[in-house]
């Protein structure tokens, strides 16, 4: 199974990988919120830190030749700040604020990927 999973990741398009990363950020944030609700601070810490690591990866892999990269870098920085605040304060509000923004950004990337694929068949 591990070999299959590795192979499927290796054959993904850049758009597929970004989509997968956003899905994992959203998943980890939701799990972190559930852990917070259950006063499982160790669990919420682990989930929030993983989400931050993925957001940091998304930020460090931006292609800065495009104008939009600066705005995305600022957004990613804000997402990580809010996740950190939720983790430090043991409060769901900062994550609840950015979760819809992250979901919307994921959808925007997904739509852009579909348009690129339609414009470049094969």
Where are these regions (language model features)?
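C-terminal-biased regions
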Residues: 1-23, 27-122
């Amino acid at each position: 199974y591990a070999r299959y999973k590795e192979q499927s990741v290796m054959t993904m398009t850049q758009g597929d990988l970004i989509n997968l990363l956003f899905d994992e950020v959203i998943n980890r944030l939701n799990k972190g919120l559930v852990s917070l609700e259950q006063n499982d601070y160790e669990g919420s810490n682990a989930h929030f830190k993983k989400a931050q690591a993925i957001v940091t990866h998304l930020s460090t892999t931006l292609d800065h030749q495009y104008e939009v990269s600066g705005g995305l870098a600022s957004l990613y920085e804000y997402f990580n700040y809010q996740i950190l605040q939720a983790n430090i304060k043991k409060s769901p509000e900062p994550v609840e604020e950015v979760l819809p923004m992250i979901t919307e950004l994921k959808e925007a990337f997904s739509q852009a990927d579909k348009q690129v694929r339609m414009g470049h068949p094969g």
